[in-house]
Amino acid sequence: MRPLTDACPKPLLTVRGKPLIVYHLEALAAAGVQDVVINTAWLEEQFPAALGDGQRWGLRLHYSMEQRDHGGALETAGGIAKALPQLAPDGVSPFWVVSGDVFLPGFDFPAAAVAAFAARARLGQLWLVPNAPHHPQGDFGLSDEGLALREAPEKLTWASVGLFRPALFADVPVGTRLALRPKLDEALAAGRLGAQRWAGAWTDVGTVERLAGLQ
């Protein structure tokens, strides 16, 4: 995304006049979510300056600042582990995770999905989309029982939005740099990684060209 991200973190890049992350914040507020934790690293001081405390959306924003506290980005699983006390203060409640650099304008973070997830013993629930041209191999298959599969005739791409239980990250020491995929594979191997299709619009805003295509 350079040179755009030389001066602006990806989630604050604008699509149709609005920062990418604001689409998520508006949808989370509409879904009744009250507290949102934003993991930051690159140019992290720009996030509180741009978004404030969240009051304008009826949210309480909390910032988990990885650059300040650990000298750099902890990747997704490491970032979640650092933020667990804010994400799930009781240590058990599930929480949403969504990447700040994906465009999901119609995703409404359904409360019914949270209730269904809480009633099961799964550690994670992923939303999957058709494979984009830049990622034709996909990430996961989907079983008839709604579980993610490592191998399948048809694979789909994880849309970078999901529900998770704190237990999946409880063994990750704070400050560890760790990608999410090993933890997803761990839940999958235990038969505790759910998945479902998402048919709405979705874009991984990973290049200048893809960003321009959304304008």
Each predicted region: which residue ranges?
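N-terminal glycine-rich phosphate-binding loop and ensuing alpha1 helix
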Residues: M1-F47, F109
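Well-ordered alpha-helical segments embedded in enzymatic catalytic cores
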Residues: L20-Y23, G79-K82, K183
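Phosphate- and divalent-cation-binding pockets in alpha/beta enzyme and binding domains
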Residues: Q46-A49, K82, D171, G213
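Small/polar loops that bind or transfer phosphate-bearing groups
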Residues: R16, I38-T40, M65, L128, ...
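Conserved beta-loop-beta/alpha segment of the NTase-like Rossmann-fold superfamily
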Residues: P48, G54-D139, S143
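Catalytic-core segments of class I nucleotidyltransferases/pyrophosphorylases
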Residues: A88, F95-W96, F103, D108-A119, ...
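A structural signal for short hydrophobic beta-strand segments in well-ordered beta-sheet cores
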Residues: L12, F140-L142, A195
